[in-house]
Amino acid sequence: MLALVTLSGNAQTKKKTTTAVEQISITAEATLNPQQKVTAHMKAGSYEGPIGIKLRGNSSLSFNQKKYTLELRDESGKDVATSLLGMPAHSDWVLLAPYNDVSMVRDPLAFQLWREMGHWGPRTTMVELIMDGEYQGIYILSEAIKRGKDRVDLNKMKKSDTKGRDVTGGYLLRIDTFNEDDATFTSKIPGIGDGIMTSQIIWSCIYPKKKNLQPEQFAYIQNFVDSMEQAIQGKDYLDPEKGYAHFINVESFVDYFIHTELSLNADGYKRSAYFYKEKQHEDGTGGKLHAGPVWDYNLAYGNCNFCNANNIEAWCFEGGNTNPTPAFWQRLLQDPAFRKAVKTRYKELRKTILSEKHIYEYIDEHAKLVAPATDRHFKEYPELLVSPEKAKASQQPSKVQEGFGMFGRGGFGGFGGFGMGDGNFQFDPVGMFANYRVSSYEEEITVLKKWLADRLAFLDKNIERFDKDWQPRIQEPVEKKMQFPGGFPGGFPGGFPGGSPNGGFPSGGFPGGGFPGGGGFPAFPGSR
């Protein structure tokens, strides 16, 4: 069933919406913002009570369709665990806006595949949102990545857990950009790729939260990650006692590699990349680092034009063009035993979970579910679709072209998202990142399936060689390459003389030279 979410504010006139699907109504007491949660009241199925709600995202805040973080609360304002729309009880939830994913299935598909591979992944329910009586389109109501028995099932840490076995876990970590709300540290091992936005691999401790994290706990988890990364890069990295197998849960890293490479996620490995560390067992075993859960796949499955994501015959782990990829992925792939484990697991999954039949069935079920609401969604956001002629032109083979490097045919961030239109500068966040465009929802589903078939064919051919003659391409550490940490401060004063490929910049480049505001590249959407 497709649920309908209704969001209204006290200061606004409420409109009655007639719908055959379930409604979730939220009444906010103040204007929503991304800094702090606003108190609101929500009715969602059997749940009715107070919540906290805030906007979420970075550059996606500029999108017409916003994303939201929800926290269920009791009357005193304390967070309370409650089931929503049939999903297990918890206090923390997310309304993901699939604005730059016309299929609206990429995040749910990624989460579903990860769960079917045997790991915890966020459960989702498709909903529609009405804000202050105005239709806001189709949303994904998702579990947030949090510690809990029905989420990431980690040992609950107390502030007194500062030594011995108690300090060993559990921890929830993320590799991403810097976030002042988290306790962060920087990897001592340089990442690989071009890394034009940053040269650093930044680890954040998500659980325990920064306000609860004790100095001894932070020191422990930082030292553990440092030791793990040093061991993987060391001369004894294959040794079962001194090498990487002593620190990581190898099976989870194998699955994470397969899952990420199938998706060719532009953010893969380097942004919204979660890990968790379990508490050591009494007998001294366990306590290893697990890869996952997976998160943030709106720029995956052929839906982006940078970080190798526009090249269906490329490896995702090599696509560190914006943020660097952690070097340990390249190093793990140098181990014949790790590659053999990948091949064995991949061939097993191809017979079931990763078969075209299984994946297509999930996509078709999802498309059937949202189909009755797509007309409303695209009426609200007509910019998501283009003419059949433009769609056809954009769907030509999209391997990275010689001479454009990471920019591919669409330019960095799709330079096709920038244009002069009637002579005025325009910013199109959809075209900015899109690897292709479509003229209808049905066409999007068809293109997505074709992309998946082609991607699986590439993986079939190359992973078959993993225990034979295949070796990863060794890339230099990103610190040895040219960096633009703050973007290109002056932009491209002269632009591309002939305009950018795929219809991006007009001849002569940006008016006034550079990006809007002179701030370099805009931030990327979708993180956290």
Give the positions of each predicted feature.
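A conserved helix-loop-beta module that forms one wall/lid of the active-site cleft
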Residues: 98-132
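Hydrophobic h-region of N-terminal signal peptides that target proteins for export
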Residues: 2-9
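Middle-to-C-terminal accessory/interaction subdomains
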Residues: 59, 63-64, 183, 199-270, ...
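Conserved oxyanion/phosphate-binding beta-strand-loop segments in alpha/beta enzyme cores
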Residues: 42-97, 214-219
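N-terminal module-boundary/linker segments of secreted carbohydrate-active enzymes
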Residues: 12-45
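Short, flexible loop/turn elements at secondary-structure junctions
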Residues: 28-30, 55-57, 74, 97-99, ...
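Structural recognition of the beta-strand scaffold that forms the well-ordered cores
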Residues: 68-71, 91-97, 104, 128, ...
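Internal "kinase-insert"/substrate-recognition segments embedded within catalytic cores
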Residues: 74-77, 90, 97, 118-120, ...
